[in-house]
Amino acid sequence: RVEVPAVELDKAKEYTICIRPIIIRKAYFSKTKKVLEKTYKFYPVPESNIRAYHIADAHNNIEEPIKAAETFGDIDFLILNGDVIEDSSNPKNFMNIYEICSRLTKGERPVIFSRGNHDLRGNFAEKFADYTPTHKGNTYYNFRIGSIWGILLDCGEDKNDNHEEYGHTVACHIFRERQTDF
């Protein structure tokens, strides 16, 4: 994971992603391919007349939210506000988040992402932060894009932790208390 300060990205107006595919990973003398690079333009959020698009509760639907967003034209940033995936039962579901981001921003616009309550359900829920954007592993954070300052809080689930639906697999109350210290 790499975090680039927004102010630096805003100044540079571009960034380059570099990867080196691994053919065989060994303890010694791993085999790799050449480094691949792709440079993206980046458009900072303007100071006024800001256009944002907000998607929530897509539940693994990709085409409908993208088509709806495209009817509004160019955006300055994208907000993905939880439950973009149906649940965390399959790590392939996480790619839906990136598919929507990629198609709507082309890597050129900021994205604000938050976890939803359905994202806490499924075999990979505990690994959610491994697959999605976080700030130092936390799903709550503050941010600044352009003239917008924000704080994103994550309430976790929508019922008490002891609700039978969760089968003793969540501890959101403690998580919410930790955020009050933040």
Q: At which residue positions do the language-model features occur?
A:
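Acidic, histidine-bearing metal-coordination/catalytic regions of metal-dependent phosphoesterases
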Residues: 1-54
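Extended active-site neighborhood of metal-dependent phosphoesterases/phosphodiesterases
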Residues: 20-30, 95-182
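An acidic-aromatic substrate-binding cleft motif
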Residues: 31-81, 86-87
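Short secondary-structure boundary/capping elements
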Residues: 60-63, 92-93, 135
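A short acidic, amphipathic alpha-helical/loop segment
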Residues: 64-69, 93-100
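Short glycine-/acidic-enriched loop or helix-start segments at secondary-structure transitions
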Residues: 64-65, 89-90, 123-124, 162
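Short, exposed beta-strand "edge-strand" segments with a Pro/Gly-rich flavor and a Y/T-containing core
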Residues: 87-88, 173
